[in-house]
Amino acid sequence: MPELPEVETVVRTLRPQIVGQSIRSLWTSGQSLRMARRLDKGRLQETCIGATICAVRRRGKYILIDFESGSGVLVHLGMTGRLTVADEGKERLKHTHVVWRLVRERELRFVDPRRFGWVQAASEPDQLPEIRALGPDPLTELDGGKLHALLAASRAPIKTFLLDQHRLAGLGNIYVCEALFRARIHPRTQAYKARSKAVVLLRAIQETLEIGIANCGTSFRDFVDATGAPGKNIEALLVYAREGEICLECDGLVKRMVDAGRSTFFCSSCQKR
């Protein structure tokens, strides 16, 4: 699933292509998404057709496309979703579900093979429950003191804590594994026991995310930016997907364990419990 760096990469590559553009028409595939209640074609048409895009931004793992009218569209990429821009004449990929036809014969396309993503039009996107429920953004809305307080109030395992979007917005499995390794914190450490390392952990989270953004995201299979280019961050991963390989910081081996169906990668020498 695209995490904060991947979503930020999509946003940054969308902006120069669609901001200032007007939407001429809208097309939908007619196929249902798994979150079908979100894809209200009538509401999308009413909100989007004739609208001028004035901003594209990220909130957690969500993409918000703002219109000059104050309304907009909220997009979640789910597991395999993509937002790309292409010429009208270019053949559409299989599993294209929504197309916004722009001026200058360009199209903004939402593609999602597994259909876990969704698109929702809203008169006030920032007031949607999904957005209001998000915790602070770790890059722009968090400091050591605030993280310390959040950690102190939780007995959940630190990895579970960091994945909770109500506590911090945007982190996912890849970048949590990487950040915990950088902070030298075992993934099963209870959150409140890590509060003394709040500043170190915040620095590790921010460094991990900034590297991911600089490398345009992590692409194992599906992720591409709005131009169709894959990310390069896989080359910068320290522990994620490196089970059995030698730790880059010591002579130990990277290990994998499974919690709640998710693989967790860590070094038991560097990250002692």
List each model region and its residues.
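Structured catalytic/nucleic-acid-binding cores of DNA maintenance enzymes
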Residues: 1-273
